Amino acid sequence: MNPHFLQSAAWQSFQEALGRKVYRQKGIDWEFMAILEPGTRLSPSRLYCPYGPTVSSIKGLKSALKALTKLATSLGVKFVRVEPLGVKFNAKDFRLKKVNYSQPAHTWQIDLNRSSDEIISQMKQNNRNIYRNYRKKGLSYRISNNPNDCKYLIKLLHGVAAHNNITIHSDKYLQTQADVLLPINSAKLHFISLESKVIAAALTYEDEKTCYYAHAGASHEYRKLSASTALLAEIIINAKKDGKLICDLYGITTSQDKNHRWAGFTRFKKSFGGYEVDLSETYDLPINKSVYKLYQAAKFLRHKIVKLKQRIK
C-alpha cells in the first residue's frame, strides 16, 4: 500500500498540533488515520479520513469501513467522511453517499524517474524559456527549512485572496504546518525573489517518494516576471535532485468548462508536462442516519438561501 501524505505520521503530528484528536488503525489490506472533528452549530461531529482509508483489496475496504464504523460509534460521532484510495469500488455497495468536494478527486503528477533534461523537455516552450532565463531578470531561487520564513508565503497568499476574492487557510493553520513539518523534513519552503523582495513562494509536502506542491502564491504586481512559473519549474527539478520519484501538483479539475474556478491553475499545472491521476471522490458514511438526514436537509436549505441572496444582489 502507498498512503497519501495526508495519511502520514507527519500529517498526524500537524493535526495534533492544531489540537485535534487523531486515531490510527490497520489490518489485513487496510489502514487509516482519522481525525475527530467535533460538531458545530452547522454540522454534527464526524470522523474524517483525508485520502483514506488506504486499501489494497475490496475486502480490505470493507474491513476498514467496518473498523471506522465501530470507532465512530464508540466516539458518538454522527458520520464518517472518507476518500478511499487503492481500489476501484461501487459506493452503493458500501452505503457511501457522495458529497461535494473536500479534497481534489484528481491530481496532476510528473514522473521524475528520468533525466532533468527529459523532464524539462516535456514542459511547454514558454515554461522552458522562463526556467532557463529567469535569473537574467534579476530573480533568484532559494529553499528554506526555517518556519519563520512562512510569513512570506502567508503575506503573498493574502494578496492572492484579496485580488481573486477567495478564502484561504488561516495564518495559524499555515504557520503550524511550517512549525511542525519543516523541522522533521516533511515540508520545504521555496521562494523566488527580486533582489531581496520575495515575489513568489510555495510550501511543498515531502515524503520518501513524492514532493507535493501544496500551497503557493505570487505577487500580482510582478506578474509579468512569471515568477510562479520559474518557481514551480525549480521545485520540480529540485525534487528530482532530492531523489523523489514523483512531483504531485496537488489537484486539478477534469471539467472542460473554461469558466470553471479551477480552470486557470489546471492549465498552469498541465503546462509542465505530466499525467492525470484519479484519486477519490469524497463520501459520507452515516452512523446516526436520522441526524445525518437533518444535517443534509439543513445544508441544502442554506445553499438555496445563499443562491437566493446572490440573485437579489
Regions found by a protein language model. Name each.
Residues 47-49, 247:
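Hydrophobic faces of well-ordered beta-strands that scaffold small-molecule active sites
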Residues 1-43, 84-89, 93-103, 107-222, ...:
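A conserved beta-strand-loop-helix scaffold within acyl/acetyltransferase catalytic domains
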Residues 54-91:
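A gly/proline- and charged-residue-enriched helix-loop-helix capping module
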Residues 50-56, 222-223:
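The substrate-binding groove and active-site-proximal loops of carbohydrate-active enzymes
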Residues 17, 21-22, 40-41, 91-117, ...:
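Active-site/acyl-donor-binding loops of N-acyltransferases
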